[in-house]
Swiss-Prot record:
InterPro entries: NADH_UbQ_OxRdtase-like_20kDa (IPR006137), NADH_UQ_OxRdtase_20Kd_su (IPR006138)
Gene: nuoB
Cofactor binding note from Swiss-Prot or TrEMBL: Binds 1 [4Fe-4S] cluster.
CC annotations in GO: plasma membrane; respiratory chain complex I
Species in which this protein is naturally found: Neisseria meningitidis serogroup A / serotype 4A (strain DSM 15465 / Z2491)
Protein name per its UniProtKB record: NADH-quinone oxidoreductase subunit B
Gene Ontology MF terms in the entry: 4 iron, 4 sulfur cluster binding; iron ion binding; NADH dehydrogenase (ubiquinone) activity; NADH:ubiquinone reductase (non-electrogenic) activity; quinone binding
Biological-process GO terms, alphabetical: aerobic respiration; electron transport coupled proton transport
Co-factor(s): [4Fe-4S] cluster
Binding site for [4Fe-4S] cluster: C37, C38, C102, C132
Primary location recorded for the protein, binned into one broad class: membrane
SUPFAM superfamilies according to UniProt: HydA/Nqo6-like
Record-linked Pfam families: Oxidored_q6
Subunit structure: NDH-1 is composed of 14 different subunits. Subunits NuoB, C, D, E, F, and G constitute the peripheral sector of the complex.
Amino acid sequence: MGIEGVLKKGFITTSADTVLNYMRTGSLWPVTFGLACCAVEMMHAGMARYDLDRFGIIFRPSPRQADLMIVAGTLTNKMASALRRVYDQLAEPRWVLSMGSCANGGGYYHYSYSVVRGADRVVPVDVYVPGCPPTAEALIYGLIQLQQKIKRTSTIARDE
């Protein structure tokens, strides 16, 4: 957990940032924004073989209950406003994981008139998972990378 020191008589000292970030990494609640074939791999990662529950990742049905949005698949111009609305409804602090080459940069349909060339043109993306479609293992690796990123963030502002 990042305990900085153990004092005599059973006292443990640590920073509030370390404790808060530890709790946040163990309770990521994603809302799915599955748009194409990448969503099948996302569902696969949530099933019994890979079991995302062991990482504290539990899929939520509503964006108001979630703090992570997984964008999986081809994002079209028509869906861009819906993606932004879902992002705005996420609880703070919120994170976005872009899954698959279509969500990362348009993918195979990059030159189509109706495709947004990456989810990062609509919402800020924290982690990119490459692949077409990425495997469930790649998604889990991306989620672990997001947990590492959350551990490094500073939650409480300090005057230095």
